[in-house]
């Protein structure tokens, strides 16, 4: 996967290309997991973030966030704990009340960042994928990003929806 990504940006300066989604289909590409490829995009700075839906599939963030109020919770999520879920649900009910939104109008999102490991070239994408799977199973969309600071996450989310955005920490 890493060699394939490097070949996509060969002879291009950094910042000239951003890839939102990559899917692999075909007889020789069947063994490549699209979800791991998506994480490699973030790791290689070819994408600012990738989004997994409730089924654990990679989706285009702008399409998913369209006309949705977004409530995001940042964390490491090595384990999905009931306390985190309770905190998020309390924040969601408050967010719905303040923004006068129904449950279907609010997208529940968890965000994991690879930025804290930016200096570590050996980022374990399979660990991030396992955490994303656990969070998807718990009923959350999962955004895995390269954002170090909270305001960057907020800017990214606000750039993909015109509706209100809130972050739970």
Model-found features: residue ranges?
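Nucleotidyltransferase catalytic core that binds NTPs
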Residues: 1-169
């Amino acid at each position: 996967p890493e060699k394939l990504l490097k070949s996509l940006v060969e002879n291009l300066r950094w910042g000239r290309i951003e890839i939102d989604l990559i899917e692999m289909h075909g007889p020789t590409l069947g063994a490549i997991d699209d979800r791991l490829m998506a994480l490699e995009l973030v790791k290689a700075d070819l994408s600012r973030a990738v989004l997994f839906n409730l089924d654990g599939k990679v989706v285009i963030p702008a399409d998913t966030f369209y006309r949705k109020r977004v409530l995001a919770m940042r964390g490491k999520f090595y384990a999905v704990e009931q306390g985190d879920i309770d905190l998020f649900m309390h924040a969601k009910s408050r967010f719905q009340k303040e923004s006068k939104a129904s449950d279907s109008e609010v997208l529940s999102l968890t965000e994991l960042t690879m930025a804290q490991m930016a200096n570590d070239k050996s980022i374990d994408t399979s660990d991030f994928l396992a955490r994303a799977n656990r969070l998807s199973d718990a009923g959350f969309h999962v955004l895995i990003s390269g954002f170090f600071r909270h305001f960057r996450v907020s800017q990214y989310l606000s750039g993909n929806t015109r509706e209100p955005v809130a972050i739970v920490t």
